[in-house]
């Protein structure tokens, strides 16, 4: 295997000079740089990541912090699409990625601390925004570059990529009101996440401008509890005309409960959710959704993280990704039911 030492001997320079050429050090003369690069090419030498790390004091790796690495969360279409955007943008810029793999918050904190301690990453992308998050405190205390997908809660100068979830939820609710709905149920994921709060806020904004009514309920993804809740609504004849869920997986859990309870969509009840994916398109019936373009969120987060790591000036601390309502068979005009 060809090493940096072999390249240095063949080019008649020191190993430190080869390292500086690999790192792109501008103090190396053009003549020396070209000589070393020609020697590397003649040996078909490609610096491995360890060599680059030693030369540049950087790992060329970005850490990805997920809220959980449970099967449920890691297979969420939103997460998969965001990661696809991150991976493609990082690959185009020569960066690798490493993700947290634990399910509990305290375990994720330890993972992040180890990545920082061993200089495994140059910066982080956080895939969520949560109130009183100790992981953000860790990143700040170590002055680590990071980007949030979501809305930051404190510092205005945190680089973040997000949708306008208040506006998106407000638009979805108005769309349903225009369909004749006036009795809503908004089912939200537990966990104190800012995206959920914003979607509830937008929903309430739209409701308050009409004579419609709504209830907000929070569910962990617990099938038994959700089934009992809707069974009770059926028995007391208090079903809403439409259920909005804050999350696609929560929506599909509710769809399966409706199937068990023999509630037919859209004749008995209607449904809508956030984050379009193949799950929504292939559902029975296909689900009306708000497309939040998660791959664009991932690409934007990766690009911003790379720019920060490379020391580029950041002109905009906030990048907004648009949203679109995708109308499908799970919603229809009430008079047509």
From Swiss-Prot:
GO terms for molecular function: DNA-binding transcription factor activity; transcription cis-regulatory region binding. Residues 4-23 bind DNA. It comes from the Bacteria. PROSITE patterns: HTH_LACI_1 (PS00356), HTH_LACI_2 (PS50932). The keyword Repressor applies. InterPro entries: HTH_LacI, LacI/GalR-like_sensor, Lambda_DNA-bd_dom_sf, Peripla_BP_I. Gene3D superfamilies: 3.40.50.2300, lambda repressor-like DNA-binding domains (1.10.260.40). Pfam families: LacI (PF00356), Peripla_BP_3 (PF13377). Keywords: DNA-binding, Repressor, Transcription, Transcription regulation. Residues 1-56 form the HTH lacI-type domain. Transcriptional repressor of the malA gene for maltase. This is HTH-type transcriptional regulator MalR. It comes from Staphylococcus xylosus. The lineage of its organism: Bacteria, Bacillati, Bacillota, Bacilli, Bacillales.
């Amino acid at each position: 295997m060809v090493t940096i030492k072999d390249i240095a001997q063949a080019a008649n320079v020191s190993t430190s000079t080869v390292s500086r050429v690999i790192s792109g050090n501008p103090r190396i003369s053009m003549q020396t740089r070209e000589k070393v690069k020609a020697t590397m090419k003649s040996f078909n030498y490609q610096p491995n990541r360890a060599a680059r790390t030693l030369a540049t004091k950087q790992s060329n790796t970005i850490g990805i912090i997920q809220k959980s690495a449970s099967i449920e969360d890691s297979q969420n279409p939103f997460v998969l699409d965001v990661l696809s955007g991150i991976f493609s943008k990082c690959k185009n810029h020569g960066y690798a990625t490493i993700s947290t793999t634990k399910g509990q918050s305290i375990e994720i904190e330890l993972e992040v601390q180890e990545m920082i301690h061993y200089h495994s990453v140059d910066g982080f992308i956080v895939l969520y925004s949560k109130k009183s998050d100790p992981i953000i405190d860790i990143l700040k205390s170590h002055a680590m570059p990071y980007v949030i997908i979501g809305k930051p809660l404190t510092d205005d100068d945190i680089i973040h990529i997000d949708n306008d979830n208040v506006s998106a939820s407000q638009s979805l609710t108005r769309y349903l009101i225009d369909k004749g709905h006036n009795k809503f149920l908004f089912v939200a994921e537990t966990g104190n996440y800012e995206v959920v709060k914003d979607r509830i806020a937008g929903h309430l904004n739209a409701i308050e401008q009409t004579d419609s009514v709504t209830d907000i309920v929070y569910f962990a993804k617990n099938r038994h509890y959700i089934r009992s809740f809707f069974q009770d609504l059926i028995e007391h004849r208090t079903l809403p005309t439409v259920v909005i869920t804050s999350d696609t997986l929560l929506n599909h859990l509710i769809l399966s409960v409706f199937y068990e309870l023999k509630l037919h969509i859209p004749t008995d009840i209607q449904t809508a959710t956030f984050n379009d994916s193949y799950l929504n398109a292939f559902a029975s019936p296909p689900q009306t959704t708000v497309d939040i373009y998660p791959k664009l969120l991932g690409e934007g987060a990766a690009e911003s993280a790379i720019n920060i790591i490379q020391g580029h000036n950041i002109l905009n601390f906030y990048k907004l990704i648009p949203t679109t309502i995708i109308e499908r068979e799970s919603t229809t005009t009430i008079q047509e039911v």
